[in-house]
């Protein structure tokens, strides 16, 4: 990922059990999310839209990308705790994104330099 980001002068984000974001110079590791999120169609598409919005207004585009991935993962974790399956997860994920407080974000989003 780092070599691709450097060579093409882009930000690369790879999601999985631990998510990684890099511009080739700075790399972040983000913990969060839940396996059930992979069962809901369009969660990745929605995340991409949120990343686009964040980098449009954020000065530090790599950190903005990592932050949104962390927030989205946290919303997914919270949603999975109360969801019965993928259908209710979709609804609860959106509700958690809408209702999440800045205190919840600051206390629970796990972003580290990798």
Residues covered by each model-derived region:
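Short glycine/threonine-rich catalytic loop with a Thr-x-Gly-x-Asp
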Residues: 34-51, 61, 86
